[in-house]
Amino acid sequence: MMNTLLQQAPSWGTTLWFIIAAVLLLAVVLGFVTYAIYFERKVIGWMQLRIGPNRVGPLGLLQTVADVAKLLLKEDIRPQHADKALFTLAPILAYAPAFAVLAVMPFTDSIRFADLGIGLLYYIALSGITVLGVITAGWASNNKYSLIGGLRSAAQMISYEVPLVMSVVGIVLLTGSMNLKDIVEAQRDVWNIVPQFIGFAVFIIAAQAELNRTPFDLPEAESELVGGYHVEYSGFRFAMFMLAEYVYMFGMGALITILFFGGWLPIHPSLDFIPGIVWFILKFSVYVFLQFWIRATMPRLRVDQLMSFAWKVLLPVALFNILLTAVVVSYQNGMF
């Protein structure tokens, strides 16, 4: 349907449909963010032999709603010597790209918004813009802790963006396309996690660093930097940074599901009667649970360990995966 609308001449009707689609997508993402935070606190609580949130609403289901309402009602404080324009712009720079990447995600064969031939490249290009919001927030706050957090984020994003991109080159070699729908369709016989297990391992580690999640959460390390790049933010601006983090996690989970877990395809052809969106949600939920598990169990790395691991371990492994995949593809095509 969206492709049909994209091919039509601009009109008030098509504009209205695009607005409705954007609002629906935003509602789904906000619903995910609301209850991802709740389940993260609940799961980590269980792992640490605690109960977790259980006060607001039945089983604590409205705890996140109460927290969001509290943030929105708090005073919006801006440091006296902060750069006003950039201080205001930073949360938008952090959030907008994280939401925009969802436009190319094919959740099923029919539920997708834009079928780009270079959907994978689009995602990689836009996701790199998020770091600009973090760096801008760190510099514009006129705070040493914020600045150090922003600089750490820049170094981390540059270091881990390289192996992240290289880890998906093997998939592009196997499928011959950067269209996310074509990548899913190419996994009908076997999911990419099997022939591209090395690439998957590199991707999921680099993705963890890109999300600034444990054990790579150095840009906002509470024990070292008070709160990192958003230490001077409060109210709805602070909420936008938190929202950007979980929206980005939503996008990364969707991308991993598409690239390595077969997207909406069933685990066996005999289970094809189950709707594709159900399979997508199940696979996506496995990744989200893995995020919670890692946060509950792993310690934070030092800065030198973080950088060394990216350049001395992940990058060589990603290059080896590209070489190995190229040899296999060449052999299959009869070049040897």
UniProtKB/Swiss-Prot annotation:
Which InterPro entries does this UniProt record tie to the protein?
NADH_UbQ_OxRdtase_su1/FPO, NADH_UbQ_OxRdtase_su1_CS
The membrane topology term of the UniProt record is: Multi-pass membrane protein
- Which of UniProt's keywords are assigned here? Cell membrane, Membrane, NAD, Quinone, Translocase, Transmembrane, Transmembrane helix, Ubiquinone
Q: Where in the cell is it found?
A: Cell membrane
Please verify whether the record's keywords include Transmembrane. Answer: yes
Select a single GO molecular function from the record's annotations and give it. NADH dehydrogenase activity
> Which residues span the membrane?
17-37, 85-105, 116-136, 154-174, 190-210, 247-267, 274-294, 309-329
Biological process terms in GO annotation: aerobic respiration
Q: State its Enzyme Commission number(s).
A: 7.1.1.-
Query: Catalyses which reaction?
Result: a quinone + NADH + 5 H(+)(in) = a quinol + NAD(+) + 4 H(+)(out)
For this record, the Gene Ontology CC terms, alphabetical, are: plasma membrane
Pfam families in the cross-refs: NADHdh
Q: Which family does it belong to?
A: Belongs to the complex I subunit 1 family.
Described purpose of this protein according to its UniProt entry: NDH-1 shuttles electrons from NADH, via FMN and iron-sulfur (Fe-S) centers, to quinones in the respiratory chain. The immediate electron acceptor for the enzyme in this species is believed to be ubiquinone. Couples the redox reaction to proton translocation (for every two electrons transferred, four hydrogen ions are translocated across the cytoplasmic membrane), and thus conserves the redox energy in a proton gradient. This subunit may bind ubiquinone.
Q: How does it assemble?
A: NDH-1 is composed of 14 different subunits. Subunits NuoA, H, J, K, L, M, N constitute the membrane sector of the complex.
Instruction: Please report the name of this protein according to its UniProt entry.
Output: NADH-quinone oxidoreductase subunit H
Could you tell me which species this protein originates from?
A: Brevibacillus brevis (strain 47 / JCM 6285 / NBRC 100599)
Lineage per the UniProt record:
Bacteria, Bacillati, Bacillota, Bacilli, Bacillales
